[in-house]
């Protein structure tokens, strides 16, 4: 089976599970009814097209028609779209580029913000509520532990490179070097102006 249909089917299943399961989200979903959102991930040659209908969202790899809105961003930016307060900041910083009707992406972000992404709800039909909650807690704890471990290792490597091995300058050394370079540049400019004045006489 080709990779692209497998990815689109997985994303479609995930979005439908979280965005179309709860009846409480019906009003938020109705704002997207009939809209087409194209998501282009920088670094990948293909894009994902989200077609919203009353009962589900279809995720397609190809779409012949025009999209109501096109979102262009790196893959690392897409998870930040769950928080609707970050949308404006992402657009202003240039991390997220929006072409077309911005209302479509705003409504999608609002819907994603309202939806509760809880892995325990996915596991509950198969394992029961208590086991699903325990597994979910263990997964969250493991992810947090892993995240802190990675951050700690990054800090250790950065300190080793700058302090112990002296392979790279520290932040204060870089700032000092930048100030000294700017001072030399100003002195050269002043000297050049003085020489030009002397040559003009």
Swiss-Prot record:
GO BP term, pick one: ubiquinone biosynthetic process
A single cellular component GO annotation: ubiquinone biosynthesis complex
Highest taxon listed in the record's lineage: Bacteria
Pathway: Cofactor biosynthesis; ubiquinone biosynthesis
InterPro entries to which the protein is assigned, alphabetical: SCP2_sterol-bd_dom, SCP2_sterol-bd_dom_sf, UbiJ
Annotated localization: Cytoplasm
Knocked-out gene: effects: During aerobic growth, mutant is impaired for ubiquinone biosynthesis and for growth in rich medium, but it does not present any defect under anaerobic conditions.
Domain called SCP2: residue spans: 15-112
This protein's UniProt keywords: Cytoplasm, Ubiquinone biosynthesis
PANTHER family referenced in this protein's UniProt entry, alphabetically: UBIQUINONE BIOSYNTHESIS ACCESSORY FACTOR UBIJ, UBIQUINONE BIOSYNTHESIS PROTEIN UBIJ
Protein name: Ubiquinone biosynthesis accessory factor UbiJ
Gene that encodes the chain: ubiJ
